[in-house]
Amino acid sequence: MINRISALLIFLSIGVSQKEYNIINLINQGGVYTQTFNDDILNGIIYRILDDKKVILGNLKNGEKDGLWTEWYPNMRKLEETYKHGILDGSVSLFYKTGQREWRHTYNNGQFEGLWTYWYENGEKMKEGSFECGDSTGIWIWWDENGHVKKEKKFKIRKKGIWTNYNEYVLIEVVKEP
């Protein structure tokens, strides 16, 4: 019985496998991808050839990016983006060549939303803060490469913030923006 179920699952997965398209053969027309030789809207897996290897970039649904997309730059830095219906929605991250994450941003329906974090190449946090409805909000903190707080800024949505600066890790000034 288990062998029959396994065989059926293999058959179904082969039968419904998605088409694959090389991105160099596609045209991006306002966020909708078509092939260069026709206007058919695409559904399937998108790849590119990198160092003679097929590298999966992401998935198209109704011609739009959907789900996790990974792009590799010539300097071997990696960018990961999450899309829903062709719009950034979720986590977006850029990585150093070493594989260490350089920054991670969050989007909701194409708008800045949630926690944004940046790191030094040594893995220490560089700065961190949040967005709400596309605006900086709450307390943003900046650190030096050794992990010591350099400055802070408190934001309120659609209002100026208050800067707190540190010198040698000691509070030196608080500046309220007009």
Tell where the protein language model's regions lie, with residue ranges.
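Sec-dependent N-terminal signal peptides
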Residues: 4-14
